[in-house]
């Protein structure tokens, strides 16, 4: 791979992933090398583009807390293209989003499925968005345990019922849909277009361009 200093791409090798380019930017302090994620972070944008597990949840929480400490009065944007994941990792990010002082704008690009759908809806009211061809998928949580003695399985069954009830309450809190309707809908996968998600109350608007009044994001 050829060097970035010669105007060419460098980045990690991966068979199933487009190689992330790195670029050099000259500043008054000298030369700095960036990747797109670092540049987005400087603009107070967190990109959640992976499955939600403990590792990715820790990354997102760390960025939320760091951006709050840097400026507690400026909005944080979370761009989402995720298939979802662990319920416990979801609740960790969710609680942190509610905990930090800045408003959290959420934008669905591609898909916000399962746990990611809850994070999309959990953004600051009025600042939850989706691109026109995005989709949102909601369903009941899956068991994160399933082996052991009969007594252990009973504990796991009770826990998944608790998680389901908690998920229903989260979705009802951050949407305009009654909890009874949500309880019925998540029996199986419920796939929503951007327009459907807007009607459901999971987002506040569908956007086609980033050209908007930046003062609303402060």
From Swiss-Prot:
GO terms for molecular function: ATP-dependent peptidase activity; ATPase binding; serine-type endopeptidase activity. It is an enzyme of class 3 (hydrolase). Pfam families: CLP_protease (PF00574). Its EC number is 3.4.21.92. Cleaves peptides in various proteins in a process that requires ATP hydrolysis. Has a chymotrypsin-like activity. Plays a major role in the degradation of misfolded proteins. Probably partially responsible for degradation of ECF sigma factor SigR prime. HAMAP family: ClpP. NCBIfam families: PRK00277.1, PRK12553.1. This is ATP-dependent Clp protease proteolytic subunit 2. It comes from Streptomyces coelicolor (strain ATCC BAA-471 / A3(2) / M145). The lineage of its organism: Bacteria, Bacillati, Actinomycetota, Actinomycetes, Kitasatosporales.
